[in-house]
């Protein structure tokens, strides 16, 4: 039975092949393969000679790869995922690839801003002259939204500006730029006595990112039980390689003063996370209070991360690729900025009867400088 079927199949295939070869005008042709459109490099001005670079291709669905050191990009080069800051002398090269197409030609552009070290090159000063509470700049900030964030057992619902989803109230936003010139990130309890909480988590993902330099934010933090403010960064490539491979840089994390881990003193923490790579060092000088205004910053150079409070010379934590176990992800590409105020979670614990609502995280500015 099987042999007979095989013989019949062979006969049929022979017929197909013979038919396919017959006739001069009836034969098939191999489709001509097209080339993906070369990337377009566009720039917008940042500050003091720095620019924000974005890449695009006219080929629908194209994936873009780029380098900044003048080397020829390939599919193993960093994938372009968001606009990035250029504040140093670089040669950006990019290609586009798309299914069914050959790779594009290389697009190249050199940047020679020659900006001195310590120069302010990007910032959000949260200025507001409208006379009313205003939306955080939508060209800079977007939002994570919803519940059960991040695997931390947090309790809040994160709300975007203008959202009426779930417990969110657009008339009482959780993130706004006040007439006082500060960004307000507000944790609220819409109905007193319930375990329903709202807050905000702002991010520059897809809008702004940078690699290397110094970033700092001047902030005043809430101290109530269950509050968990943070100022941090994640790799642009989180969507393609996930966390923790993308890398996480925690410029600041703080939990309530009553937590047993605090051992009677107030503190903030600067951390790094990657694949099999973790580090966290606390800053707790005498009489330090996170409820007062302080500037929290990070100095990012190749192979090294440093954290400081109030002055770049006041470094309290240093992490290096040469001394840490695991995979160091912080030389692999740009990262985007996040600021949020979590409620509850595995680290701070839940709010209790002493917790003050609303609790507010105030941000005076976020600034990026050259090293």
Residue ranges and their predicted role:
Residues 1-11:
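Bacterial N-terminal signal peptides that target proteins for export
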């Amino acid at each position: 039975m099987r042999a007979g079927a095989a013989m019949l199949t062979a006969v049929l295939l022979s017929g197909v092949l013979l038919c396919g070869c017959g006739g001069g005008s009836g034969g098939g042709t191999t489709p001509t393969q097209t080339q993906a459109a070369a990337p377009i490099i566009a720039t917008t001005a940042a500050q003091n000679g720095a620019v924000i670079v974005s890449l695009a291709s006219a080929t629908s669905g194209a994936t873009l790869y780029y380098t900044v050191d003048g080397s020829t990009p390939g599919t193993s080069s960093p994938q372009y995922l968001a606009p990035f800051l250029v504040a140093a002398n670089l040669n950006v090269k990019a290609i586009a690839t798309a299914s069914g197409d050959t790779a594009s030609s290389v697009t190249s552009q050199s940047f020679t801003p020659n900006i001195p070290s310590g120069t302010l090159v990007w910032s959000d000063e949260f200025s507001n002259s409208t006379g009313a509470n205003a939306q955080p700049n939508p060209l800079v900030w977007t939002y994570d939204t919803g519940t059960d964030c991040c695997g931390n057992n947090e309790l809040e619902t994160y709300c975007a500006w203008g959202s009426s989803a779930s417990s969110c109230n657009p008339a009482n936003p959780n993130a706004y730029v006040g007439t006082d010139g500060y960004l307000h990130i507000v944790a609220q309890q819409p109905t007193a006595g319930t375990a329903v909480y709202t807050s905000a988590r702002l991010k520059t993902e897809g809008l702004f990112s940078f690699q290397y330099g110094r970033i700092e934010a001047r902030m005043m933090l809430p101290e109530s039980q269950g509050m968990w403010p943070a100022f941090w960064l994640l790799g642009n490539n989180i969507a393609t390689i996930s966390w923790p491979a993308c890398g996480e840089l925690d410029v600041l994390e703080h939990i309530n003063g009553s937590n047993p881990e605090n051992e009677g003193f107030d503190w903030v923490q600067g951390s790094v996370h990657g694949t099999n790579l973790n580090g966290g060092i606390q800053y707790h000088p005498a009489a330090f209070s996170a409820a007062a205004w302080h500037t929290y910053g990070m100095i990012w150079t190749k192979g090294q991360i440093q954290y400081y409070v109030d002055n770049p010379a006041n470094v309290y934590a240093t992490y290096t690729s040469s001394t840490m176990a695991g995979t160091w992800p912080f030389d692999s590409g740009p990262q985007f900025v996040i600021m949020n105020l979590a409620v509850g979670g595995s680290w701070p614990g839940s709010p209790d009867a002493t917790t003050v609502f609303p609790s507010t995280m105030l941000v005076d500015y976020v600034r990026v400088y050259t090293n």
